[in-house]
């Protein structure tokens, strides 16, 4: 029985690396996968899932208007699919998460989603919110803060390295823009720590 999975974390926990390893494992056994990534994130070139450790793979793009169920159903007409993998799943809409649940429930294909849980203000992304609510299986991928504690928050930095507290939820960037930290250091750096 297929399931909808959500692998979530803060930045730099290895989400894309884990996705690429999963795709490789399926392909090594002559099983077909379909990999998607968000069109909005073109840091490494449009249509590529790229890991910080240097591995990458071509991927189909999704944007807010994509009907993932219909795209995947059309693809099935030409090729059997054994798994769907979604990178940057935080950028999915509520409707797209529902569409992916239909891929699982109606097409019986497992869907593995990888994404951030929260943004730089510790608020859920739309895609993450509904994956946390509707996924059959949740798994947190862990990374560490500079102090050694588990990092489960992310700070947004400006060009000078100062913490940014306000702004648009979505701003594409990597290590130069974001820093994964523990809850204590998130509160401390954003001025939300009680004295």
From Swiss-Prot:
PROSITE patterns: TK_CELLULAR_TYPE (PS00603). It holds the Pfam family TK. It is found in: Cytoplasm. One of its GO terms (biological process) is DNA biosynthetic process. It comes from the Bacteria. GO terms for cellular component: cytosol. Zn(2+) binds at residues 145, 147, 182, 185. GO terms for molecular function: ATP binding; thymidine kinase activity; zinc ion binding. Keywords: ATP-binding, Cytoplasm, DNA synthesis, Kinase, Metal-binding, Nucleotide-binding, Transferase, Zinc. Its EC number is 2.7.1.21. It catalyses: thymidine + ATP = dTMP + ADP + H(+). HAMAP family: Thymidine_kinase. This is Thymidine kinase. It comes from Mannheimia succiniciproducens (strain KCTC 0769BP / MBEL55E).
């Amino acid at each position: 029985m297929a399931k909808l999975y959500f692998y979530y974390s803060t930045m730099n926990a290895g989400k894309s690396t884990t996705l690429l390893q999963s795709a490789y494992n399926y392909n090594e056994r002559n099983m077909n996968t379909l990999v998607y990534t968000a069109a909005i994130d073109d840091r490494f070139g449009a249509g590529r899932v790229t890991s910080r450790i240097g591995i990458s793979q071509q991927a189909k793009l999704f944007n807010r208007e994509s009907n993932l169920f219909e795209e995947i159903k059309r693809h099935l007409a030409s090729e059997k699919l054994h798994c769907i993998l979604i990178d940057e799943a935080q950028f999915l809409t509520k409707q797209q998460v529902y569409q992916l649940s239909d891929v699982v429930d109606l097409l019986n294909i497992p869907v593995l989603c990888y994404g951030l849980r929260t943004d730089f203000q510790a608020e859920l992304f739309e895609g993450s919110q509904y994956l946390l609510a509707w996924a059959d299986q949740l798994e947190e991928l862990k990374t560490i803060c500079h102090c050694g504690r588990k990092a489960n928050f992310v700070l947004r930095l400006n060009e000078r390295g100062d913490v940014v507290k306000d702004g648009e939820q979505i701003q594409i960037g990597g290590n130069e823009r974001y820093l994964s930290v523990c809850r204590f250091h998130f509160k401390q750096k954003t001025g939300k720590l009680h004295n």
